[in-house]
Amino acid sequence: MATDPRKILVTCALPYANGSIHLGHMLEHIQADIWVRYQRLRGNDINFICADDAHGTPIMLKAQQMGITPEEMIAAVSEEHQKDFAGFDISFDNYHSTHSDENRELASSIYLELKKNGFITSRTISQLFDPEKEMFLPDRFVKGTCPKCKSEEQYGDNCDNCGETYSPTDLINPKSAVSGATPVMKDSEHFFFDLPQFESMLKEWTRSGSLQTETANKMQEWFESGLQQWDISRDAPYFGFEIPGETNKFFYVWLDAPIGYMGSFKNLCDKRDDLDFDEYWKLNSTTELYHFIGKDIVYFHSLFWPAMLDGAGFRKPNNVFVHGYVTVNGAKMSKSKGTFIKAGTYLNHLDPECLRYYYAAKLNSRIDDIDLNLEDFTQRVNSDVVNKIVNLASRNAGFITKRFDGKLSDNFVAPELYNEFVAASDRIAELYETREFSRAIREITALADKANQYIDEKAPWVLAKEEGKEQELQEVASVGINLFRVLMAYLKPVMPELAARTEAFLNETLTWECIAQPLTSHEITKFKALFNRIDPKKVEAMVEESKEDAAIEMAAKEKAEAEKEKANQTELDKEPIADEIEFDAFEAVDMRIARIISCEEIPKANKLLKFQLDIGGETRQVFSGIKSAYTPEELVGKHTVMVANLKPRKMKFGMSEGMILAAGPGGKDLWILEPHEGAQPGMRVM
C-alpha cells in the first residue's frame, strides 16, 4: 500500500554576503542537493531553500571600503552566488536574503516572544571601542601582539601562530584593524538570550537519537562546561536590524541568520498557494525539517537555534546534518598554490557534474573532512563515469540505431542479471536516505563492472561481423542499453544533467519505479556523446587561474592597506622634523610679509607662476611652483610670507628674488601662508 508523500523542508547554511562561493561551500550544497533530488525522485514533497547571510560589521566595513552602500554590495554578491549555485545545478526552490522584510518581521516577533517569556536579559558590559571611528570592535577587528608567543599582528580572539585563545583585552599593544587607533574600554548595555534555561530541553533533544553521534558527543562536552547566556545585541554603527524598542541597538548577525531559513521559506510561501508557513514551523508539526551545515557552526545550530525556536513556540529541526571541511591535495586550500578555487573559476574550465560525482564518491554520514585530490579526481571521474557507465551506452547504441532502426529487442535475454540490478534499488535507496553517498556510488560502480563484464563476454562487435547473428546482436546490445538505463536512474540525484541527456537518448523519463521492468520493443534516439573526459590540462588551467586571481586579490589588498596606512599617518610621519639647527642659523633667515601685486602664468612653464610682491617700499619678482594649486586670479591682493634674503636666482624665465612660503605635500595639495589681518607688507616674521 502506497504511503503519503513526506513533507520535507531542507536548508543549507547561509553563505556570508561579503565574498565568493568556493569549492568548500560547494561540498555542502552538493551534498544537500543530492539528498533533495533523491527525495524528489521518490515522490516526496520537498522544499529546498537558502539565502545570503547579509548582516554584520564585516559587510558594513567592506561596503565602506568599496565606496558603495551595504545594500548595493549584498545585491551584487547575491547575484554572483545564485549564478554559481545554478552553475552546479543546485536546485533551490527559493534563494533569498536575511536583509528582507520577512526576516525583519520574524526576527522582531521571535525576539519579542522570547522577551515576553522571560528569556531575554540585559546588563552593562565593557568592550574595546575605536575612538576615531566611534564604534565598538568585534574580536576580529582588533589586532595586536599575542600575549603568549609575542607574535605581532594577531587577531583579538586567537593567535594564528601558536593557537592560543584569549580576550581582545589580553592583546599587547592592541590596535583597531579599522582605523589603526588604540582602542579604549567603554561600557554599553547589551541584551542576552538566557540559554541555560533550555539545558534540560537540549539534553533531551540530544538523547533523542536523531543527531549524529559526533554532534551529540560534542554537545555533551558543552553541557559539562556549562551553558552561558548569549549576547544577541550589537551597538551602532552596525548593518542589520534594530532591536524593537531600543535605540542604536541591533540584533547580532547570528540571531537573525538562522531565522533567515524561516524568512526564505516565508518568501516562498508568499509566492505559492500550495504552501502553508505554519504547517512547517508550528509546534508539533508533522512535517520534517533538516539543516545541512559545516562543523564550524554546530554550536549555533545545535544549541542557540533549537533553544530560540523552543522559547518562541516553534518546532525544532528533526536533524542537523553536519559535514567536515574540504582539503585540496591533502592540505588546507591555499590561494598561493591555486587550490583555493572559486566556484566561478571551476565553472570556467570543468563540468560541474564531475565535482558532484567526486564529492558523492567521498561523502558519508559522518563529520569527516573530504580531500579533493585533483589527480585522483581526474582519474576517478574518467574511470567510473566515462569508462564504466557512459561507455555502456556508447558501446551498444550504434548497433541498435544503425542495424535495427533504433529499436530495442522484443525479447530480454538476461532477466537474472537485470533482476540483480533492480534488487539493488532498496540498498541504494537506503544509502541515499542515510547520506551514505560513497557507499551508494560503490554499489552503482560494482553493478557497472558486472554490466561491462556481460558485454565483454558477449562481444557484440564480434557478433556484428557474423552472418545470422543479427537477433543475438540486437538482444545483447539491448541488454547493455537497459543496464545503462538502471545505472543512470540510480545516478540521477548525483548527475542530473547527464541523466537529462540520457533521458533524451533513451526517449524515456528516468524514475525509480520505471526500472522495475526492462525496455523492450522501445525506440531510442541516435546516440550523441553524453559525457566528456576530464582533460588534465583544464585542471591545470583552473589552478593557474586561481593563482592569478589570488595574486590580483593580494595586490589589491596590499594597495588598500597601504592607502589605509598612509591615511592614518600624521604629517610628522610623512615628513619627520629636520635635524636641529643653532639659533644663529634660524636668525639668518629673513622672512617678511608680502602683498601680491600681480600674478601671471608663464607660457611653456608647467609648474611656475610669476609674482610681483610688495614688501613695504620695495617690489620683488618671484617665481613659485604652485601653479597646480592656484589660479593667478585667486592670489592677487592676498598677503603671504616670503624669504626676503634668499640669494637671487637666475632662471629660464627671469630672476627670482626670494621664495614664497607654502605648506603641503605638493601638487594640488599646497597652501600659501596667509598672515592675520594687521600684518603689513615689509613686517618681519619673528
From Swiss-Prot:
Keyword Zinc, does the record have it? yes
* Annotated catalysed reactions: tRNA(Met) + L-methionine + ATP = L-methionyl-tRNA(Met) + AMP + diphosphate
Question: Which cofactors does this gene product need?
Answer: Zn(2+)
So which domain of life are we looking at?
Bacteria
Q: Which UniProt keywords apply?
A: Aminoacyl-tRNA synthetase, ATP-binding, Cytoplasm, Ligase, Metal-binding, Nucleotide-binding, Protein biosynthesis, RNA-binding, tRNA-binding, Zinc
Indicate where this protein is primarily found. Answer: cytoplasm
Q: What is this protein called?
A: Methionine--tRNA ligase
The gene that this protein is the product of is metG
